[in-house]
């Protein structure tokens, strides 16, 4: 979910930053066709609170490689690289100064059966590629509220109509910056 949000937010912001991209039918292809120098210049024009993504971070890139052997390793390394690339903007420091990153280093390791990890990552990418936040970025309302309510609707279902939950400060800080 967060990966998709960052990806779509990035694409929205590059369209705002570059007039040529505003009318592009395929923004990602236009970005892929840019020279490395032009791409780096475009990244400098983005608002500070926008994640900086490399072209290989795009969801479409992962989607096009989902049938590669060990896809889960590509998926994990992509999220980890996004975390490291944007560490100064999207991280929270602990009391001892350690940085808490956006994504865990090996997210797919949470799937117990090692032979199912790539399938899990493929299924996630298949779902993410069909959804878009694009319209939400120009709106001025809290679209997260509905999403969180949906995600946690069954969490505390026996104690009232709406779920009761606690968002840790580190997560709330990251969400607030996004």
Predicted regions and their residues:
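Non-catalytic, mostly N-terminal accessory regions of nucleic-acid modification and defense proteins
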Residues: 1-178
């Amino acid at each position: 979910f967060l990966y998709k949000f960052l990806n779509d937010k990035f694409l929205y912001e590059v369209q705002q930053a570059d007039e040529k991209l505003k009318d592009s039918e395929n923004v990602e292809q236009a970005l892929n066709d840019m020279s490395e120098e032009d791409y780096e210049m475009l990244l400098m024009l983005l608002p500070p609170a926008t994640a900086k993504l490399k072209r290989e971070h795009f969801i479409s890139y992962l989607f096009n490689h989902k049938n590669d052997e060990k896809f889960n390793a590509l998926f994990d390394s992509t999220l980890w690289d996004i975390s490291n690339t944007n560490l100064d903007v999207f991280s929270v420091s602990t009391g001892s100064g350690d940085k808490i990153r956006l994504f865990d280093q090996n997210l797919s390791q949470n799937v117990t059966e090692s032979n199912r990890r790539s399938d899990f990552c493929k299924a996630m990418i298949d779902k993410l590629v069909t959804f878009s936040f694009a319209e939400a970025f120009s709106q001025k309302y809290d679209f997260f509220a509905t999403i969180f309510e949906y995600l946690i609707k069954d969490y505390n279902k026996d104690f009232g109509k709406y779920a009761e939950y606690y968002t840790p400060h580190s997560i709330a800080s990251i969400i607030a910056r996004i």
